[in-house]
Amino acid sequence: MHKKPYSKQRYIAASYACTKDISAILTKCLKLIEKQHHMIGRQYEKNYGINPMWILHNSSTVHQSFADFNLKKNAKDIRTYDFTTLYTSIPHKQLRKELRWVIKEAFKSSKHSFISVYKHNASWTNSPGKHTEHLDCNKVIRLMNWLLDNIFVTFGDKVFRQVIGIPMGTDCAPFLANLLLYSYEYKWINEQKELKNWHVLKHFRNCSRYIDDLLMINNADLMKKYMTDIYPKELVLVPDDTDGKSCPFFFFSICKLPSQIPSYLLQSTI
């Protein structure tokens, strides 16, 4: 999603960082953990009619969602939201706490004690190979904590330790950010379910998020009301400035046609 006006981002290269190998291992673990939470989300939807897992990695899910709305002809509004400075604003204390919950829940759901890490992927196991890199739940958490404790940046002849935010160039950064936001989204949805606020939850059944860009369909702008309940104050969520009939998302411009029949036009902006 292209931001207007364009936000100023600062990039720091990390190709020779000593933490790169550890970040690569953690990336494979977190990718598997996220996949497990997708399974948890699908089961949650079967039980309660809403999926708390909003994370997507490509546009095919969005295309399918619009195809479903076109078939049913029941799209009413569409809006996007953007976390203005997600990576640079993530509080480490909250990241540790929420990711610890995410990791533990994934291990619990998988019914496995270890993650075996291979060259290109990772998998759940109860019997890791003798010569295979493997981690239990606590070791994954320790690895994440160690990485957060050892983020340093050199600028000229000075060295700074990063205590707020995570470097975008770190291999596992997208998974850390995604799963942090997911933990808030899941817990808020589950809280509303426990309170039996189905009149609220029905407006959050069609949500998709590509890291820091959020797409809401038929939300009736309720996200504007509840976003400060879902996310902490450090993570500022800003709605688009459209009329709710068109919006930018995932490098596309999405439009609902004037006939009010829920259709869409996707046009690349790059």
What are these regions (language model features)?
Residues 64-229, 242-249, 256-257:
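Conserved polymerase palm-domain catalytic core
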Residues 1-77, 84-85, 100-104:
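Non-catalytic, regulatory and substrate/membrane-recognition segments associated with hydrolase enzymes
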Residues 237-241:
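Long, internal stretches of domain cores in catalytic or enzyme-like folds
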Residues 8-10, 20-23, 34-35, 88-91, ...:
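Short helix/loop capping segments that flank catalytic or ligand/cofactor-binding pockets
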Residues 19-33, 58, 182-188, 193, ...:
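Inter-domain linker/hinge segments that demarcate the starts of reverse transcriptase
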Residues 1, 267-270:
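Short, intrinsically disordered, charge-balanced linker/junction segments flanking boundaries
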Residues 6-10, 164, 269:
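Amphipathic alpha-helical/coiled-coil segments positioned at domain termini
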Residues 15-16, 219-220, 269-270:
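Secondary-structure transition/turn motif
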